[in-house]
Amino acid sequence: MNKALFLCLVVLCAAVVFAAEDLQKAKHVPFKRAAICFCPGKPDRGDLWIFRGTCPGGYGYTSNCYKWPNICCYPH
């Protein structure tokens, strides 16, 4: 009985370690909370960020246009 309890504890600890590792990877993946938008003179679609004055960093945005009170950000 003692060995079975120890084995269960080892398996539980391993599961916690692997679950925590997956959560650390998930924190570094950028997640966009933007809608689709289009600006005059731009052939592609952009990302519409609601109630923002500037484009957020970390997404590779290089240009934008304002659609008050929102901003449309373009990655290329």
From Swiss-Prot:
Subcellular location, principal: secreted
Propeptide: 20-31
Gene Ontology MF term list: ion channel inhibitor activity; potassium channel regulator activity; toxin activity
Name of a matching Pfam family: Defensin_4
Keyword list, A-Z: Cleavage on pair of basic residues, Disulfide bond, Hypotensive agent, Ion channel impairing toxin, Nematocyst, Neurotoxin, Potassium channel impairing toxin, Secreted, Signal, Toxin, Voltage-gated potassium channel impairing toxin
Origin: domain of life: Eukaryota
Listed GO biological process terms: regulation of blood pressure
Signal peptide: 1-19
Listed SUPFAM superfamilies: Defensin-like (SSF57392)
Location in the cell: Secreted; Nematocyst
Tissue: Moderately expressed in the ectodermal tissue from the distal and proximal tentacles, body wall, and oral disk.
Coiled coil: none
Function: Blocks Kv3 voltage-gated potassium channels. Reduces blood pressure.
Family: Belongs to the sea anemone type 3 (BDS) potassium channel toxin family.
The name this protein goes by in its record: Kappa-actitoxin-Avd4d
Gene source species: Anemonia viridis (Snakelocks anemone)
